[in-house]
Amino acid sequence: MDTRNARFFRWYRTLPLAIMAFMLALSLGVDYLPINMVRSLFFPVSYAERIDDAAKRYNVDEHLIAAVIRCESGWNDTAQSTAGAVGLMQLMPDTAQNISQMGKVDTNKFDPNNLTDPATNIEYGTAMLSYLQKELGSTDEVIAAYNAGLGTVQTWTKDSKGKDFSESITYPETKHYLERVNEALRQYSKYYPNGMSVL
């Protein structure tokens, strides 16, 4: 047996052990895996510096931005929905135009017609989150409004009358979206406690 075949068979024998160790760690929970492995496998972040810059500029939690991106597009900067939403943060072109007309974004740097550009998409998506934060009272309301619209969430807030806000949500899709984004927000906050661009 030549050296190359011997190395292959040695590697092949250890592969099942490596897989078993990985599966055991997963069954025990991701807390037993090295943090960098958890980050890269389960909670990746692309465009960390762009997110950090936009978060500071608009006073929005960068973990929230990452959670929205994860749930909206799965970090696919070319994602397009059947409804016409575009890019990382799945913005509707009309929404970007409205944000632009309100003067929330520097249109000399970020053209609202260029939502497939990750930096532009993050800028407009974060500006939208910032606008919703100013209009609404809680992070849950902001997340729900990003999905269902500001007017709808304001109606739900009025109807909640002291109940937990999530109980007043009448759209199953938005209720599920709120749960998913909140879970992603918890995980990004846990695994990136010092920020997205600090690894």
Language-model region placement:
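Hydrophobic alpha-helical transmembrane segments of integral membrane proteins
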Residues: 12-13, 145
